[in-house]
């Protein structure tokens, strides 16, 4: 007890080992969960820092580098999963300006840095995203890491938390790779990989760049960059010229890989009929978007993983509906009538319990009056498309899409109270108060508020009378203030209305949080949060819930050993809830593969529809228990 108290934790936070006594049934086993006895505990979270947890990692870059390489300001993520099979969820943090770090969960909210012996430091690269998944189907968690300029890397686990890099994995070791998601796109049983790519560099970081235009075929094109001909150079395909003459810098093509087994992937082509537009025509070139996030999700209820890709800047979001055999087509233009302008992250939940998944996409609209009125915001519509049914506005705010059940969505951000959450990155729908309705938690903040209209006005005024050398131009960017957004929380109440409860739920620390993941770090059956901070050490947020909960984990057939893509339905007197087991899909981050249900009655029925088409039904399910459901006995 003395040891626990010395850490600033309570006795009820002492290590709680994974259950050793299980009840078994046909295709399942279950064990009792022991919610902590926290007298006087309030709903929400308790923030824990490295002084008590042992997580001393810091994700930071120098001020000069943040000015010269603005893409690095997009931060880094975190991946959660049990890498050594001891029953405790471990954590892997990416560092944008230094080493990455793997921390072994010792229980009792204490973590040990095992990066060196695990051999996953990834020194010398600007690491962005991470994902822990069973890539090779041997029932341990392997590691995927992305970086700016370094693409994606794969490290295979030996089952004991020691990793070896797969140097011939087939993954591209270039491009500005960001977030990742995995799913079985072709029904062959293993997990395929999508990597959202941004850029490695941008001309925004190169003041004084000289672009020369010419007219080719009746349209303006960029002919040279700093005297270098675009055609045949690294600049080919990098720029477009808009209808009003503005020069647009393109992002990089994303990468979709087919899992070939044994830790090897094959890069799939965009232009061989794999991807088709709304009219079913094969794409003639890959989209050159500024990719930030990507998630697989069965959007239309046909049992196969569709895709939602969040793109920054002028790039539109991409929605791709799967045929189950690895081919994708854009939905009808009437499906989504608008989009967020600078989309950061996406998450899904059946908010109104009608059996169809709804979704939120995050942008950068401020919650408070002062910030909102200093932001430079605009609504973007494709020039020349006014009056056409295909025109889609790009809105500078969050968008919430409620499924109508027919493949189309109604935008409902203002109806739900969720149009603004600050400079937001990762949304996670989760039932924090365990009342049976998904609440929403969001990571926020940015190193430089480059949309601050007051600073922009000052700089424009100076530029009218002065000339600045490139180094001086970069230095002027230091005037943009930090946006210490911290964490945000919205509680879902009646009639789809969400209330901002950030302060009441323990999210009062001003900080820049970007990558965010959910996991059960103390084995009490609720979901805690892990936030990777920019310029600071990460924060852990212990969930303070004490009421009834139901935790579901899946044991799938190899090679999809975690049952990724399965739909889990829980039906009781509290109603019906449905969730999907996902892998990756967070901004630069990856949750532990587990699903939490609150508001469940004393007895429930759990139905699992596996990606293979099999089905498992477990009746008489009790609350305050964890259920492990096996696909091997499924029908």
Question: Where does each model-flagged region fall?
Answer:
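Gly/Ser/Thr/Pro-enriched helix-cap/hinge segments flanking short amphipathic alpha-helices
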Residues: 11-12, 44, 52, 62-65, ...
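Beta-propeller blade repeat segments, especially FG-GAP/WD-type strand-to-loop junctions
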Residues: 34-35, 45-46, 99-114, 151-166, ...
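Hydrophobic beta-strand segments that make up the repeating blades of beta-propeller
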Residues: 45, 88-95, 140-147, 191-197, ...
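Repeat-based blade/solenoid architectures
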Residues: 55-77, 96, 119-131, 169-181, ...
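Beta-propeller blade termini
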Residues: 75-85, 104, 127-137, 156, ...
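Asp-box/WD-like beta-propeller blade repeats and closely related beta-sheet repeat scaffolds
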Residues: 117-131, 146-185, 195-236, 241-243, ...
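Short, conserved, GDST-rich strand-edge loop motifs in beta-rich repeat architectures
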Residues: 198-249, 366-392, 446-482
């Amino acid at each position: 007890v003395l040891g626990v108290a010395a850490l600033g934790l309570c006795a009820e936070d002492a290590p709680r080992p994974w259950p050793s006594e299980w009840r078994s049934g046909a295709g399942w086993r279950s064990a009792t969960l022991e919610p902590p006895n926290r007298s006087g505990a309030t709903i929400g979270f308790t923030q824990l820092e490295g002084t008590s947890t042992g997580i001393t990692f810091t994700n930071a870059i120098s001020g000069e580098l943040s000015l010269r390489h603005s893409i690095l300001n997009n931060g880094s993520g975190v991946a959660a999963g049990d890498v050594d099979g001891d029953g405790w969820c471990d954590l892997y943090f990416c560092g944008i300006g230094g080493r990455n770090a793997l921390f072994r969960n010792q229980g009792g909210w204490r973590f040990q840095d095992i990066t060196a012996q695990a051999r996953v430091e990834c020194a010398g690269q600007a690491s962005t995203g991470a994902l822990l998944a069973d890539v090779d189907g041997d029932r341990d968690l392997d590691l995927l890491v992305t970086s700016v300029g370094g693409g994606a890397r794969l490290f295979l686990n030996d089952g004991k938390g020691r990793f070896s890099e797969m140097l011939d994995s087939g993954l591209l070791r270039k491009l500005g790779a960001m977030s990742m998601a995995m799913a079985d796109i072709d029904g062959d049983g293993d997990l395929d990989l999508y990597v959202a790519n941004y850029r490695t560099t941008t001309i925004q970081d190169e003041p004084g760049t000289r672009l020369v235009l010419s007219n080719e075929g009746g349209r303006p094109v960029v002919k040279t960059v700093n005297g270098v001909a675009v055609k045949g150079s690294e600049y080919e395909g990098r720029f477009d010229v808009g209808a009003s003459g503005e020069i647009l810098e393109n992002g990089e093509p994303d990468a979709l890989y087919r899992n070939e087994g044994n830790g090897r992937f094959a890069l799939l082509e965009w232009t061989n009929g794999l991807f088709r537009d709304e009219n079913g025509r094969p794409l003639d070139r890959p989209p050159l978007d500024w990719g930030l996030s990507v998630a697989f999700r069965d959007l239309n209820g046909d049992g196969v993983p569709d895709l939602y890709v969040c793109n920054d800047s002028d790039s539109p979001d991409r929605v791709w509906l799967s045929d189950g055999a690895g081919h994708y087509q854009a939905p009808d233009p009437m499906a989504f009538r608008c989009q967020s302008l600078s989309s950061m992250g996406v998450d899904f939940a059946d908010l109104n319990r009608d059996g169809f998944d709804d979704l939120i996409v995050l942008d950068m609209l401020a919650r408070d009056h002062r910030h909102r009125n200093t932001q430079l915001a605009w609504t973007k519509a494709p020039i020349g498309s006014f009056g056409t049914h295909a025109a889609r506005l790009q809105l500078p705010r969050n968008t919430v899409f409620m499924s109508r059940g027919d493949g189309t969505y109604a935008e409902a951000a203002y109806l739900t109270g969720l149009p603004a959450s600050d400079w937001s990155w990762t949304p996670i729908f989760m039932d924090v108060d365990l009342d049976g309705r998904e609440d929403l938690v969001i990571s926020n903040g940015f190193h430089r508020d480059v949309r601050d209209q007051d600073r922009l006005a000052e700089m424009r005024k100076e530029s009218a009378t002065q000339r600045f050398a490139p180094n001086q131009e970069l230095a002027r960017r230091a005037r943009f203030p930090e946006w210490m957004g911290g964490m945000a929380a919205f509680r879902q109440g009646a009639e789809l209305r969400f209330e901002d409860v950030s302060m009441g739920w323990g999210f009062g620390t001003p900080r820049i949080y970007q990558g965010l993941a959910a996991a059960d770090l103390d084995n009490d059956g609720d979901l805690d949060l892990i936030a990777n901070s920019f310029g600071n050490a990460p924060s852990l947020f212990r969930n303070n819930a004490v009421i009834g909960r139901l935790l579901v984990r899946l044991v799938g057939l190899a090679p999809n050993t975690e049952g990724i893509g399965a739909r889990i339905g829980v039906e009781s007197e509290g109603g019906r809830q449905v969730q999907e087991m996902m892998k990756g899909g967070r901004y630069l981050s990856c949750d532990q593969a587990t699903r939490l249900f609150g508001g469940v009655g004393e007895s429930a029925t759990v139905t699992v529809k596996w990606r293979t088409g099999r089905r498992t039904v477990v009746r008489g399910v009790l609350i305050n228990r964890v259920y492990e459901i096996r696909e091997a006995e499924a029908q």
